[in-house]
Amino acid sequence: MRYTGLMGTLLTLVNLLQLAGTLRIAAFNIRTFGETKMSNATLSVYFVKILSRYDIAVIQEVRDSHLVAVGKLLDELNRDKPDTYRYVVSEPLGRKSYKEQYLFVYRPDQVSILDSYQYDDGCEPCGNDTFSREPAIVKFFSPYTEVQEFAIVPLHAAPTEAVSEIDALYDVYLDVWQKWGLEDIMFMGDFNAGCSYVTSSQWSSIRLRTSPIFQWLIPDSADTTVTSTHCAYDRIVVAGALLQAAVVPNSAVPFDFQAEYGLSNQLAEAISDHYPVEVTLRKI
């Protein structure tokens, strides 16, 4: 028994050391995240529990133009230790009255923000813009990872325009490269990249998929939905030799918080209809 206990302790220490030696990044579509959800004590506990797993988390479907819910979320994330997390948030995005924001929360002791910008996808009033919610792009610096500078490009694609919007991320890649001279770019979010929104015959028309520049880390067979559907809507795609080499093999997965925390269907779906998708990067 003593031997078994010692081995268990050693395995735990090894796991902790492995975790400490990585940077964990996630994208999480929290369905209709705003004041109502954040005011629910039960839901807020799970938002904090889930997001605390990550060094960087990109939250989509944020509907909080006055940042009341965002402020409460950061207060809870920083409750035990001030300045554990900081945030940067996009302007409200959308073609009509319905707007969403992209929210990045990150640990300042692990990464810092070097720059950011809103991708210009054309004239919205003219009707020739590309995205329903154009990406808000952030360049991070981490002194501890094998790749020290990298950009994250989030996308919450409109379901009926998923094919064209995912394809247009190739143009975003070129724009980031031209602006910053940076090839190490991570695209992540709810692409609606599966089931009826992107069929098997449509992948050949998506440059982000057909170009050898990009590695798709979440496979088509994955299920990133909380409900009874089985769809790989949420994805992580990486470009750049340094970033691709820094990815820990097999670390890109959906995080099934329902199974992890033993939640009922009702509670899990109240949190969101999507699981986060996550990936880890090696530290030096």
UniProtKB/Swiss-Prot annotation:
Entry EC number(s): 3.1.21.1
Disruption phenotype: Mice develop symptoms of the autoimmune disease systemic lupus erythematosus, characterized by high titers of anti-nuclear autoantibodies (ANA) directed against nucleosomes and double-stranded DNA, the deposition of immune complexes in glomeruli and full-blown glomerulonephritis. Mice lacking both Dnase1 and Dnase1l3 show vascular occlusions following bacterial infection: defects are caused by the formation of intravascular neutrophil extracellular traps (NETs) clots that obstruct blood vessels and cause organ damage.
Signal peptide (UniProt feature, chain positions): 1-22
Gene Ontology terms: cellular component: extracellular region; nuclear envelope; zymogen granule
EC class of the enzyme, as a word: hydrolase
Gene Ontology MF term list: actin binding; deoxyribonuclease I activity
Keywords: Actin-binding, Apoptosis, Calcium, Cytoplasmic vesicle, Disulfide bond, Endonuclease, Glycoprotein, Hydrolase, Nuclease, Nucleus, Secreted, Signal
InterPro entries in the cross-refs: Deoxyribonuclease-1_AS (IPR018057), DNase_I (IPR016202), DNASE_I_2 (IPR033125), Endo/exonu/phosph_ase_sf (IPR036691), Endo/exonuclease/phosphatase (IPR005135)
GO biological process: apoptotic process; DNA catabolic process; neutrophil activation involved in immune response; regulation of acute inflammatory response; regulation of neutrophil mediated cytotoxicity
Site label Involved in actin-binding, positions: 35, 89
Modification note: N-glycosylated.
Disulfide-bonded cysteines: 123-126, 195-231
Glycan attachment residues as annotated in the record: 40, 128
Residues the UniProt record annotates as site (Nitration by tetranitromethane destroys a Ca(2+) binding site and inactivates enzyme): 87
Cofactor: Ca(2+); Mg(2+)
Domain of life according to the entry: Eukaryota
Note describing how the cofactor binds: Divalent metal cations. Prefers Ca(2+) or Mg(2+).
Subcellular location: Secreted; Zymogen granule; Nucleus envelope
Organ and tissue specificity: Highly expressed in the parotid and submandibular gland as well as in the kidney and duodenum (at protein level). Expressed at intermediate level in the ileum, mesenterial lymph nodes, liver, ventral prostate, epididymis, ovary and stomach (at protein level). Expressed at low level in the sublingual, preputial, coagulation and pituitary gland (at protein level). Also present in the lachrymal and thyroid glands, striated muscle, intestine, the urinary bladder and the eye.
Active-site residues, record numbering mapped to chain: 100, 156
Reactions mediated catalytically: Endonucleolytic cleavage to 5'-phosphodinucleotide and 5'-phosphooligonucleotide end-products
Similarity annotation: Belongs to the DNase I family.
Function noted in UniProt: Serum endocuclease secreted into body fluids by a wide variety of exocrine and endocrine organs. Expressed by non-hematopoietic tissues and preferentially cleaves protein-free DNA. Among other functions, seems to be involved in cell death by apoptosis. Binds specifically to G-actin and blocks actin polymerization. Together with DNASE1L3, plays a key role in degrading neutrophil extracellular traps (NETs). NETs are mainly composed of DNA fibers and are released by neutrophils to bind pathogens during inflammation.
Official protein name in the record: Deoxyribonuclease-1
Gene: Dnase1
